């Protein structure tokens, strides 16, 4: 059996909500893939003045993405730096905390409960792209190739950069760790250089967590938000395969129009976007992945 279904699963699971400063719609669709391995989080006003959104694109199984979806916010809220409003450090530490939890006996037991197969060991991992809004400041932490794009002055302001093995800095680390990059893949296998999980790439006891073949340490980008900023678009890589960032934002803006933005209007914008991105068939390979997007409208 190949990676694709004979017909795509077009039904969507969409959640909407709002807080003091944001309205959001999060929508996911399995599409042509045999299984759904995306996960996501959305929590406006998780505490006063803080909202959190994130997408996690699983690979090698769904279990790590589901584990992170369940635990990320709880661990972030427990973090000492988070409580002190040191959000950049808190995000970095929470990414690493996910890996720490995964290797515990309790973590392994939970992974086995999520797994779709009966194999003894999980070789799964996931990307992580998390946006934290504190008052008028946006932080985006990224490990992997999911993305956040800010619609600023009706143009794209990119909040993350993909971590790919061919990137010179990433490739250098991989080679120092004793690995190699072939066809854009770590040791010929994984086409990401940073991810949560993927524990078999992180087992060299002589290396620190930031020196392994694959690392969970995110880049964090910070920007001050203003009246020129309209919404965030978070997505797993399946959302970004067929349209460039500017065209994605145009598609969303065409749905929003000049109307007052509501949860239902954002729901329509998110679901219409996934429908447009879904390929009519699998011959080209693009538009065939699981798709998850979160639209976060910034109230004025």
Curated annotation (Swiss-Prot):
Residues involved in Mn(2+) 1 binding: 57-58
Ranges for domain PPM-type phosphatase: 23-298
Localization in the cell: Membrane
Main location: membrane
UniProt cofactor note: Binds 2 magnesium or manganese ions per subunit.
Function summary: Enzyme with a broad specificity.
Protein's name according to its UniProt entry: Probable protein phosphatase 2C 2
Species the sequence originates in: Paramecium tetraurelia
Top-level taxonomy: Eukaryota, Sar, Alveolata, Ciliophora, Intramacronucleata
